[in-house]
Amino acid sequence: MNCINQAADATEDTLRLSMDAKATVKIGPFSRGGKSRIQVAAADHDFAPEATMTPVGIFLPTLAELFFYGVTSHVTSDCLVDCLAQWWETVRERFAHITTLVVNLDNGPENHSRRTQFMQRLVDFVRHYRLTVRLAYYPPYHSKYNPIERCWGILENHWNGTLLDSIDTVLAFARTMTWQGRHPIVHLVTATYETGVKLTKDAMQQVETQLQRLPALGKWFVDIVAPV
């Protein structure tokens, strides 16, 4: 993994990003631990939340830039690729010279390289934007080394001791955290995503023809090459 990341960071037309979803946040008057300078009344039992939000993060390690997407629906394969596409739309003019994205991921249930809908959506992304995407997965029990994980710890410390009793409050705290002196760019995602979407075996075989898997490590390193 270090070799892949170092090579990406040293290549002028390649941009490396780290992507992951944080644990779902319950919206409501719930105690979250931590300390507050003001007296805050919280519920003494975790009743049904008023809403939930799952932060999806995209982090650019070499630039120390962070992007958060507050998802109010299920974080599915479609959701993750939609966040990736939304992010690219906001930065593509800055990175017009970039031809390859190297994406650091953990091997989660919605984004692993055998997840048929995830791979189909990434193939569509590559075709649409004419970018090569290289997926570089951290092995089991090593996701803590994914750079985005360090950002989640900062966010958690930032809002501990606070009642996250509305979606606006969650977004406000996400916007005011800092990483190396910079605030993240934060977006709210209200689209509804269905779970369980998958391809047929025959359809996935067609997708596999667009994938280049590293021999012996095919689950962990996958290239989706842009069309010529």
Segments the model singles out, each with a brief description of its role:
Residues L17-S18, T100-N107, L135-P140, F173-A174:
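Extended hydrophobic secondary-structure segments that form protein cores and membrane-embedded regions
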Residues L105-F118, P139-Y145:
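Acidic, metal-coordinating catalytic cores used for nucleic-acid/nucleotide bond scission
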Residues L135-N157:
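RNase H-like two-metal-ion nuclease catalytic core shared by retroviral integrases
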Residues M1-A41:
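Charge-mixed, compositionally biased segments that are often intrinsically disordered regulatory tracts
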